A protein has these predicted regions:
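Residue-level signature of mid-helix packing/kink "hotspots" within the transmembrane helices
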Residues: 50-58, 141-142, 246-250
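Conserved MFS/SLC helix-loop-helix module at the cytosolic interface between two early adjacent transmembrane helices
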Residues: 55-88
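Paired small-residue
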Residues: 83, 94-102
Length: 252
């Protein structure tokens, strides 16, 4: 497989992974109404996944720079599939919490490795690919509510999660069979954990900007669907609102 096809495949895998978040946010009102889970508990379920994702990024993800990117991608995406199935079948706070924890850790393991391989596979287009990575992440997130509103009407809460678990499983099979370019040994870093990079003020500043962006997204999306449900708005209107909120990020 040539490098352009590898990059495209990995970008689509990133988009599918991000789509999970769009689906999850738009199903919060269904969890509340069908299973009686409190809003505060739902907020905790959503938030814990971001924390476990961070743990995965600073602990295991740096191994992608040491020639293990492919293994991390397969491992991370597999954990996402497991968490996704748990979110589909779970009906209690504990089950959903564990599933979200696994899903978040999987994302924190796979996504940095996916980004790393894209950069290594096509170094001549480094800047363009960085922009494309963000665009596919946001586009995947914005597609999630559309997937929810179309599939959940026919198959209920499990439908969108099972659908995405199947899509991500296909990417696991594809990626496990292709030759993924790894970081050359002479370019592998000496730092053991990614948190060591925070000593660099420029990197720390960029991370804080990213934190503020995703803090805004997390607050808005976790409240939007619940608020629209309380206002008796149509389900499609609540879901499309999440997509419209994210679309400008794709263009910009």
């Amino acid at each position: 497989m040539n490098k352009q096809r590898i990059v495209t495949t990995l970008l689509l895998a990133i988009g599918s992974s991000s789509c999970l978040y769009g689906v999850m946010f738009t199903m919060l009102d269904d969890y509340r109404n069908n299973f009686g889970i409190a809003e505060s508990a739902l907020g905790f379920i959503v938030g814990v996944g971001f924390f476990t994702s961070f743990i995965g990024q600073v602990s295991i993800a740096p191994l992608a720079d040491r020639g293990r990117a492919k293994r991390l991608i397969v491992l991370g995406l597999t954990l996402e599939v497991i968490g996704c199935i748990g979110m589909a079948l779970g009906q209690t706070f504990v089950v959903l919490l564990v599933s979200r924890t696994v899903m978040g850790f999987g994302a924190g393991t796979a996504l940095p490795a996916l980004r790393r391989v894209i950069i290594v596979a096509d170094p001549e287009n480094f800047g363009r690919n960085l922009g494309r990575i963000l665009s596919f992440e946001v586009a995947g997130f914005a597609t999630g509510p559309v997937v929810s509103v179309v599939i959940a009407d026919f198959f209920g809460i499990p439908g969108p999660f099972i659908f995405l678990a199947g899509i991500i499983s296909c990417f696991i099979l594809i990626i496990s069979r292709i030759a993924v370019p790894e970081t050359a040994k002479e370019h592998q870093p000496t730092e053991r954990f990614a948190i060591d990079l925070l000593k660099n003020r420029a990197i720390a500043s960029g991370i804080l900007i990213g934190v503020s962006l995703f803090f805004m997204i997390g607050v808005f999306d976790s409240l939007w669907v619940l608020m629209m449900d309380d206002l008796d708005a149509a389900q499609w209107m609540a879901n499309i609102g999440v997509s419209v909120f994210a679309l400008p990020l794709v263009v910009l």
